[in-house]
UniProtKB/Swiss-Prot annotation:
InterPro entries per the UniProt record, alphabetical: EFTu-like_2, eIF2G, eIF2g_C, eIF2g_dom_2, eIF2g_GTP-bd, P-loop_NTPase, T_Tr_GTP-bd_dom, Transl_B-barrel_sf
Residue ranges constituting the tr-type G domain according to the UniProt record: 39-248
Catalysed conversion reaction: GTP + H2O = GDP + phosphate + H(+)
SUPFAM superfamilies: EF-Tu/eEF-1alpha/eIF2-gamma C-terminal domain, P-loop containing nucleoside triphosphate hydrolases, Translation proteins
Annotated spans, G4: 190-193
Any Pfam family the entry gives: GTP_EFTU
Any one GO cellular component localisation term in the record: eukaryotic translation initiation factor 2 complex
Region (G2): 76-80
Segments of this protein annotated with the region G5: 225-227
Gene, per the UniProt record: EIF2S3
Function: Member of the eIF2 complex that functions in the early steps of protein synthesis by forming a ternary complex with GTP and initiator tRNA. This complex binds to a 40S ribosomal subunit, followed by mRNA binding to form the 43S pre-initiation complex (43S PIC). Junction of the 60S ribosomal subunit to form the 80S initiation complex is preceded by hydrolysis of the GTP bound to eIF2 and release of an eIF2-GDP binary complex. In order for eIF2 to recycle and catalyze another round of initiation, the GDP bound to eIF2 must exchange with GTP by way of a reaction catalyzed by eIF-2B.
Name recorded for this polypeptide: Eukaryotic translation initiation factor 2 subunit 3
PROSITE patterns referenced in this protein's UniProt entry, alphabetically: G_TR_2
Length: 472
């Protein structure tokens, strides 16, 4: 921070100032102005059938295209988790009718700007800063949601207006939401510009019948066209009015699950100009601050001469924090946060740190190599259409020595079932994981060359390993 006082953010002067010297964590809320000016505090998952327009809706609201990778653009599908932040504003002129008084903009927009609607006066003022988690297909979505790699507060369920409802995946998404215990849902009837009014009304009745008796019963159904940005302000209004501000824990020791990591150095960079690795993730609890000493577990994993797993946690320091393009002095739960560290960049390149947990030194949970879980299996495989042969889609019981894929936090690792009885199972993990008793994990099995979600479990206890520490 050249030329300025330390502890005061200099980037984006048009946003609210953050000062570490005066920060009182106990007074922060998910609506504190100095927080939502720069970062999102509410996470909303977008759920829906493939090609029903999830990414387009996110783009219409936030102006951010969540499809970032070349192979995703070519196939027009989302493969990695996409995050996009949006600020939602409300006009402070009471004469302006709803829903026109709501507006959404990208996360670097100033917190107040004058109205441009003819016949109204006053300013648009920031009321919410939300983060959309645009999940690839439902299997990954369910695993992501289940193991809590991101705290989800609400969901947008997308249904395309030009197809009949429900599509096979849609019922799974509802199952996913039920498993997740997500209470707040908005149903968006998209592509309304492609159908006649009678068709839209007919589908509206189909949707009503479909959600009856599920968690989504009573959820508002909003007709929109994401491409034409039609009715997007209604979605903004409902996000403000229908999704309550979630309770957040700002006072605990901070903990972040890494879902992305990268080396930001360009090839041929001078040694003196090298920057440390960057880890990205969603903070589950606590507040991370610039200058804070951090620990990353399990850290560097290796095997000793006897083939036993060893872990060496990485210790480092936070040099920068950012949310999309906004610099932060401190970061609170919600949204995707980038953490610039002094970690060797080669350890971070190309998502190498995914699955690790970052937090305050000495406050992170144990590292497990074996887990004992109480598990719950789904009755049938999701998303497998079975005609005739009904047996194929039934989920078979866990068998001893089979290899499952286990999702814990953001880590996907293999796990061999070493013992199983009734609803308890023991799993030996291929990679060690930093987690704690009581955490939820997702279980997937290989079915016809694909990993399919077959159930979830909760950690009862397990075998932990002591991290090794350098003597120097």
């Amino acid at each position: 921070m050249a030329g300025g006082e330390a502890g005061v953010t200099l980037g984006q002067p048009h946003l609210s100032r953050q000062d570490l010297a005066t920060l009182d964590v106990t007074k922060l809320t998910p609506l504190s102005h100095e927080v939502i000016s720069r970062q999102a505090t509410i996470n909303i998952g977008t759920i829906g059938h493939v090609a029903h327009g999830k990414s387009t809706v996110v783009k219409a609201i936030s102006g951010v295209h969540t499809v970032r990778f070349k192979n995703e653009l070519e196939r027009n599908i989302t493969i990695k988790l996409g995050y996009a932040n949006a600020k939602i504003y409300k006009l402070d002129d009471p004469s302006c009718p709803r829903p026109e008084c709501y507006r959404s903009c990208g996360s670097s927009t100033p917190d107040e700007f004058p109205t441009d609607i003819p016949g109204t006066k006053g300013n648009f003022k920031l009321v919410r800063h939300v983060s959309f988690v645009d999940c690839p297909g439902h299997d990954i979505l369910m695993a992501t949601m289940l193991n809590g790699a991101a705290v989800m507060d609400a969901a947008l369920l997308l249904i395309a207006g030009n197809e009949s409802c429900p599509q096979p995946q849609t019922s799974e998404h509802l199952a996913a939401i039920e498993i997740m215990k997500l209470k707040h849902i908005l149903i968006l009837q998209n592509k309304i510009d492609l159908v006649k009014e009678s068709q839209a009304k007919e589908q509206y009745d189909q949707i009503l019948a479909f959600v009856q008796g599920t968690v989504a019963e009573g959820a508002p159904i909003i007709p929109i066209s994401a491409q034409l940005k039609y009715n997007i302000e209604v979605v903004c209004e409902y996000i403000v009015k229908k999704i309550p501000v979630p309770p957040r824990d700002f006072t605990s020791e901070p903990r972040l699950i890494v879902i992305r990591s990268f080396d930001v150095n360009k090839p041929g960079c001078e040694v003196d100009d090298l920057k440390g690795g960057v880890a990205g993730g969603s903070i589950l609890k606590g507040v991370l601050k610039v200058g804070q000493e951090i620990e990353v577990r399990p850290g560097i994993v290796s095997k000793d001469s006897e083939g036993k797993l060893m872990c060496k946690p990485i210790f480092s320091k936070i040099v920068s924090l950012f949310a999309e393009h906004n610099d932060l002095q401190y970061a609170a739960p919600g949204g995707l946060i980038g953490v610039g560290t002094k970690i060797d960049p080669t350890l971070c390149r190309a998502d190498r740190m995914v699955g690790q947990v970052l937090g305050a030194v000495g406050a992170l949970p144990e590292i497990f190599t074996e887990l004992e879980i109480s598990y719950f299996l789904l009755r049938r495989l999701l998303g497998v259409r079975t005609e005739g042969d009904k047996k194929a889609a039934k989920v078979q019981k866990l068998s001893k020595n089979e290899v499952l894929m286990v999702n814990i936090g953001s880590l996907s690792t293999g796990g061999r079932v070493s013992a199983v009885k009734a609803d308890l199972g023991k799993i030996v993990l291929t990679n060690p994981v930093c987690t704690e008793v009581g955490e939820k994990i997702a279980l997937s099995r290989r079915v016809e060359k694909h990993w399919r979600l077959i159930g979830w479990g909760q950690i009862r206890r397990g075998v932990t390993i002591k991290p090794t520490v350098d003597d120097d």
